[in-house]
Amino acid sequence: HYYYGSDMYVNEAEIVSGIPSSYPGYDLTIGSSGEPVITIQEQLNRIAQNYPAIPTVTVDGIYGSATAESVRAFQSIFNLPVSGIVDFPTWYKISQIYVGVSKIGENIR
């Protein structure tokens, strides 16, 4: 018995573009700090080079009002619920757009 048919085969890829840094498992909001905040701040600043409506922020690892405002602008541009909080959908979209604008996936072989 062949559930998928007899011509089924598995193909593999070396690397598929994706999330440069994994979601930390919790939302980032005002008062959050550490590496995940630095990641978001750096990625938002890079995205802002292509989307100037997103304000740049100081990369200090502290999620303050400026980071929240940058996140709100990003969410608005990319049709996400505008909360200023980096939840999983926002993290994933920031990562996806970052990969696109920084072109880090282009030369992977």
What are these regions (language model features)?
Residues V37-Q41, A68, W91, S95:
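Extracytoplasmic/secreted envelope proteins and their assembly/folding machinery
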Residues F88-P89, I108:
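Residue-level signal for alpha-helical context at structural boundaries
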Residues S76-F78:
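Phosphopantetheinylated carrier protein domains
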Residues V71-F74:
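Conserved hydrophobic/aromatic packing and binding residues within compact polymer-binding modules
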Residues Y2-G61, G100-R109:
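Acidic, Ser/Thr/Pro/Gly-enriched interdomain connector segments
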